Amino acid sequence: MTATRNVKGLLGTKLGMTQVWDENNKLIPVTVVQADSNVITQLRNAEVDGYVAVQIGYGQIDPRKVTKPLAGHFEKAGVTPRRHVVELRTADAASYELGQELSVEIFEAGQKIDVVGTSKGKGFAGVMKRHGFHGVGASHGAHKNHRKPGSIGGASTPSRVFKGLKMAGRMGAERHTTLNLTVHAIDAEKSLLLIKGAVPGARGQVVLVRTAVKGA
């Protein structure tokens, strides 16, 4: 599948949330993402790979902890080893160069973006917390069933539990994408992106900031 649109993206570290005043004296909640040391580590093309994309490396890592195949991969690109890599399919991949550094200035204030991250892990959670079940009545015959899911299926028909039924289980720690967020401001000197609203993940989590897929 060939990319038909230009997509820009950066890997960064979520530093946390704060609030800033806008020009209308309105308090805006923002998430601060630091996106420094992004570099192009590989270029994909349709002739060799069957699709066009750029591979971006981010984050420092001790060279002694890098496997030899990966060390050779980074050496071929002429860059120091990076801890995280991600591929972005974009139609203008040929306009990039190996070893090219990317800064937060590829985005601009007011631009719509998507942020991909790993949601906070909540551990084993019940159906009320995990799926928003209302639970069972607090009285009138309910006996130690207040937070239970209730019936999970029929007896003789269908005499089984359907796949995908909402039950208790591990919650969170999953890849999550928040669409159509807005870049509130950019600090190029400190490589910071101020993104209006919340983004997935905990403080210190690596997130991918990219051009909005839906382009709203």
Swiss-Prot record:
Q: Give the CC-aspect GO terms.
A: cytosolic large ribosomal subunit
Q: Which SUPFAM superfamilies match?
A: Translation proteins
Alphabetic keyword roster: Ribonucleoprotein, Ribosomal protein, RNA-binding, rRNA-binding
Answer whether the UniProt record assigns the keyword Cell membrane to this protein.
no
Pfam families per UniProt: Ribosomal_L3
Name the source's superkingdom: Bacteria
**Region entry Disordered, spans:** 137-157
The Gene Ontology biological process annotation of the record reads: translation
Please provide, alphabetically and separated by semicolons, the GO molecular function terms listed in this UniProt record: rRNA binding; structural constituent of ribosome
User: What NCBIfam families has UniProt attached to this entry?
Assistant: L3_bact (TIGR03625)
Q: What does this protein do?
A: One of the primary rRNA binding proteins, it binds directly near the 3'-end of the 23S rRNA, where it nucleates assembly of the 50S subunit.
Q: How does it assemble?
A: Part of the 50S ribosomal subunit. Forms a cluster with proteins L14 and L19.
Q: Which family does it belong to?
A: Belongs to the universal ribosomal protein uL3 family.
Task: Please identify the protein, giving its name as recorded.
Answer: Large ribosomal subunit protein uL3
Q: Organism source for this protein?
A: Paenarthrobacter aurescens (strain TC1)
Native organism taxonomy: Bacteria, Bacillati, Actinomycetota, Actinomycetes, Micrococcales
